[in-house]
């Protein structure tokens, strides 16, 4: 099993961000190990876990990073964001303050992460319906306004946890594979090859190659 896990076509680093106590560690453990710990304390030390999924016949290995409790001190370092191609920005649907802080997290993410990082807004603890403090429509509207995807999850009862991670990984894969097609077509100048030409503006060519390399070589 371990050997199979080492075989993959793409490796994507995805970070979990958001206030302390919103359930980031349990989202991570639910997706990667199908575990949930009611007694879970704030994460201490750097923690990441991996899991591979299949998309279009390709093996995508996700390396998912948890904030290691640094968010309590507002001390997440730029190293945490380095190389990340995806981010799950998590709040607790039963605590409005964690949702209010989403804007600050989004700003920090955009200040430190790659410009093209794929971001998903995640309203966690959807099992606490009777305590809901953040209306779904309000969060969805915020996500649309800021070009984020959006989903509500429950790490406790597993609702939408698989979907959240698979959706963001699939979106990242689509972007990366499109760039590969664009790059190959733009650089293929050999006559007689039966390749559909996809025009890529010369000014962005170099940038595209660099970003792709970043994604592949994490």
Curated annotation (Swiss-Prot):
Disordered as annotated region, ranges: 183-218
The organism of origin for this protein: Diplobatis ommata (Ocellated electric ray)
NCBIfam families recorded: small_GTP
Function: The small GTPases Rab are key regulators of intracellular membrane trafficking, from the formation of transport vesicles to their fusion with membranes. Rabs cycle between an inactive GDP-bound form and an active GTP-bound form that is able to recruit to membranes different set of downstream effectors directly responsible for vesicle formation, movement, tethering and fusion.
Essential cofactor(s): Mg(2+)
N-acetylglycine: modified positions: 2
Record: residues binding Mg(2+): 25, 43, 66
Residue ranges annotated as propeptide in the record: 216-218
Organism taxonomic ancestry: Eukaryota, Metazoa, Chordata, Craniata, Vertebrata
Name of the protein this chain belongs to: Ras-related protein Rab-11B
Membrane spanning stretches: none
Keywords: Acetylation, Cytoplasmic vesicle, Endosome, GTP-binding, Hydrolase, Lipoprotein, Magnesium, Membrane, Metal-binding, Methylation, Nucleotide-binding, Prenylation, Protein transport, Synapse, Transport
Pfam families the record matches: Ras
Compositional bias ranges of the Polar residues kind: 201-218
Binding site for GTP: 20-21, 23-26, 37-38, 40, 42-43, 69, 124-125, 127, 155-156
UniProt-listed PANTHER family: DRAB11-RELATED (PTHR47979)
GO biological process: cellular response to acidic pH; constitutive secretory pathway; endocytic recycling; insulin secretion involved in cellular response to glucose stimulus; melanosome transport; receptor recycling; regulated exocytosis; regulation of endocytic recycling
